[in-house]
């Protein structure tokens, strides 16, 4: 599937790479299963870069619209689960 990750032009290269890493963890959860700790670690880093709820909703909404994968539901399941692997 071809699509672009949502970006903010104010991010540094490192921040952009870390945001993409979070979205890739979400993809992995849907496609093969993601390691719960890695997913939550990527989400925590994402929240350091995108602390506001409004921007988070905007970026995650754009990602879900293009990919059909829900970052919100993925993180929610990871938080509520005690399984080592998260599969959506």
From Swiss-Prot:
Pfam families: UPF0223. It comes from the Bacteria. Belongs to the UPF0223 family. This is UPF0223 protein YktA. It comes from Bacillus subtilis (strain 168). The gene is yktA.
């Amino acid at each position: 599937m071809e699509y672009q990750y949502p970006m903010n032009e104010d991010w540094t290269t490192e921040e952009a790479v870390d945001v993409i890493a979070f979205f890739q963890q979400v993809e992995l959860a849907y496609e093969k299963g993601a390691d719960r700790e890695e997913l939550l670690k990527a989400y925590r880093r994402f929240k350091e870069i995108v602390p506001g709820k409004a921007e988070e909703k905007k970026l995650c909404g754009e990602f879900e619209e293009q990919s059909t994968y829900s970052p919100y539901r993925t993180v929610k399941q990871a938080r509520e689960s005690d399984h080592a692997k998260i599969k959506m």
